[in-house]
């Protein structure tokens, strides 16, 4: 039995400062039938804390956030998960005195005016690969001394930005 040697593959992990876009290599189809975007490229072109969708499955989205400085406070309508992809991010959590600030039926999270009333739950200092639960009934705030990138798993909300035509590959990748 003959053993085939695998192709040499190199895994490269990008960052906000250094990434290779990559792309879908279409054999016999149309690139528009596939979704491909680069989270670091999307974050590099976004304003701090814009919630840009980079993945979607029915009402669920993966949003890319450019972390830079201090965000406003937000309250999720359902549990959300923040995965740090680049940089160091401080996530401040507090248990809301009034969880009713998020109306029933809301999807995603809501921006809150100022610092909401509540009990401090703690602070998470997360780096690349760390995931943090952002629980319903709490409020959260991000802080990054240096620019970073967070992927946020949530439901598409009123401030989810969908830029599919801008961020997705729409033509075959050029061959070398």
Feature map (PLM): residue ranges:
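His/acidic/aromatic-lined binding-pocket segments of jelly-roll/cupin-type domains
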Residues: 72-74, 79-84, 124, 132
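Conserved short histidine dyad/triad with adjacent acidic residue
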Residues: 61-78, 95-99
């Amino acid at each position: 039995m003959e053993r085939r040697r695998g192709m040499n593959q190199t895994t490269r992990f990008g960052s906000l400062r250094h990434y290779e876009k990559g792309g879908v290599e279409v054999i016999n189809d149309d690139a528009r039938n596939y979704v491909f975007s680069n989270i670091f490229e999307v974050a590099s072109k976004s304003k701090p804390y814009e919630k840009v969708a980079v993945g979607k499955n029915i009402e669920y989205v993966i949003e890319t956030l450019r972390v830079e400085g201090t965000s406003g406070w937000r309250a999720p309508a359902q549990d959300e998960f923040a995965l740090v992809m680049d940089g160091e991010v401080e996530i401040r959590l507090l248990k809301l005195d009034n969880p009713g600030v998020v109306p029933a039926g809301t999807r995603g999270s809501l921006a809150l005016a100022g610092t909401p009333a509540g009990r401090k739950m703690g602070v998470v200092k997360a780096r690349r690969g760390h995931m943090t639960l952002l629980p319903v009934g709490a409020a959260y705030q991000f802080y990054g001394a240096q620019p970073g990138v967070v992927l946020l798993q949530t439901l598409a909300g009123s401030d989810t930005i969908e830029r599919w035509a801008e961020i997705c590959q729409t033509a075959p990748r050029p061959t070398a």
